[in-house]
Amino acid sequence: MEKRLQEAQVYKEEGNQRYREGKYRDAVSRYHRALLQLRGLDPSLPSPLSSLGPQGPALTPEQENILHTIQTHCYNNLAACLLQMEPVNYERVREYSQKVLERQPDNAKALYRAGVAFFHLQDYDRARHHLLAAVNRQPKDANVRRYLQLTQSELSSYHRKEKQLYLGMFG
């Protein structure tokens, strides 16, 4: 168990190095390998193996904390990588950011990335929700402010069109 945690940590660090080098596909591969090392160790997730008989020893609280930290960092870093790769898979960015926010609801980077994903998925209300939370944590971040402004603009445009539609129907 300890060995798998260490291997996951090594893969995560290799992913971080690849990210810094701009090798996003390689980084994604390393983060996925790290997560694969952790598969089945997380007691908070159901495991199909539990019905097959006794499991190995339970994780200590410290090991569980290490596991969750590695998972959270990998998911956050996966979202960052995917935003750098063309074409961007915004659905995956949303999914990975949400996994981070389940454990760290105040994570400003995950809030921003989720907001960007929701914006591009045209879910402007949820984009606004996440971007407002991000701007509250990082008020000087120009990227967060820019996406919040774009989202507000899209929402205003949507509401104007909706109003015109209803005026035409009931006017």
Swiss-Prot record:
Transmembrane segments: none
The entry's keywords: Repeat, TPR repeat
TPR repeats: 8-41, 72-107, 108-141
Organism: Mus musculus
Protein name: Tetratricopeptide repeat protein 9C
Matches recorded under InterPro entries: AIP/AIPL1/TTC9, TPR-like_helical_dom_sf, TPR_rpt
SUPFAM superfamilies: TPR-like
Gene3D superfamilies associated with the record: Tetratricopeptide repeat domain
SMART domains associated with the record: TPR
Pfam families: TPR_19
Family per record: Belongs to the TTC9 family.
